[in-house]
């Protein structure tokens, strides 16, 4: 849906601006870019927004290996997968941070998975009425969801 795409785009723009301003090495990608999570060729996903800091993972055809951060914007058809199956896949693959933007409930669920495949996973829940800190940048980068919500119609 349009709202889903608008929210994903605004998040990607905010991340890109932060990275560019800081001269960072990570790159922001958006669906429909394929991400091959493991070596068996069977686990191909297309996250809504994701960050890759190791550019050797970019084969030109797909991203090969776990992104550093993944953001999924839920829609009625993806909601169950975003909270269930995908979380498990991202933890197993070594994603460091996973956000679920739950538009219906106006929440941003942040899983800080760390670098130990979720062994010491932290979970935080934010409202979509303020800033949400990006953990892989130690909270220095913040996504202003109030601004995003105000710029997106039909939310």
Locate the predicted segments by residue.
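N-terminal, charged amphipathic alpha-helical interaction modules
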Residues: 1-2
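A glycine-rich, hydrophobic loop/mini-helix early in the fold
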Residues: 23-25
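C-terminal interaction segment
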Residues: 5, 9, 13-18, 27, ...
């Amino acid at each position: 849906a349009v709202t889903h795409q608008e929210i994903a785009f605004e998040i990607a723009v905010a991340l890109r601006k932060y990275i560019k301003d800081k001269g960072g090495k990570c790159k922001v990608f958006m669906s429909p870019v394929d991400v091959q999570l493991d070596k068996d060729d069977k686990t191909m996903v297309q996250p809504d927004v994701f960050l890759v800091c190791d550019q050797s993972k970019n084969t030109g055809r797909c991203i090969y290996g776990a992104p550093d951060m993944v953001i999924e914007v839920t829609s009625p058809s993806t909601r169950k997968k975003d909270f269930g199956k995908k979380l498990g896949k991202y933890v197993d693959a070594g994603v460091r941070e996973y956000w679920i933007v739950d538009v219906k409930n106006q929440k941003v669920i942040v899983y800080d998975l760390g670098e130990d495949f979720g062994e010491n996973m932290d979970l935080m829940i934010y409202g979509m009425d303020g800033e949400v800190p990006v953990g892989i940048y130690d909270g220095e980068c913040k996504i202003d969801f109030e601004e995003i919500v105000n710029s997106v119609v039909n939310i």
